[in-house]
């Protein structure tokens, strides 16, 4: 009996290998041989994603793992799983709006430089007769492509053009 059991185990180990079936929202998305390695990869490549204007990344649905014996010929597909998870991830981007008299003039990605430019413009026009309510606000979006981010130099030029228009309009009314 022990010989028979040993033979069955040998056949199973010869034909099958232990592999994790990975599913997301109840849908099978692939196979991995090491669930811990995939979790580390998810953490480093998705959750801790680093890039321009990225504030944070969330995964609403974490993958589930189920250990199964599958045929040895089956190949794992960690890269495809990572692509599916990246598609499911929500990336929140941070950007800054330069506002003049309650009107958003432009968007930038560096708050320190934007605030410095705003202070320079305020200083240059402190003796003018018009009221300049200039500010920089922090904003967030999931789609950075919908925002036209400018360099701070371009933003400063756009604000100065608007200020010049306001000064001209103010002088015409006098």
Regions found by a protein language model. Name each.
Residues 1-174:
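Membrane-proximal envelope biogenesis segments
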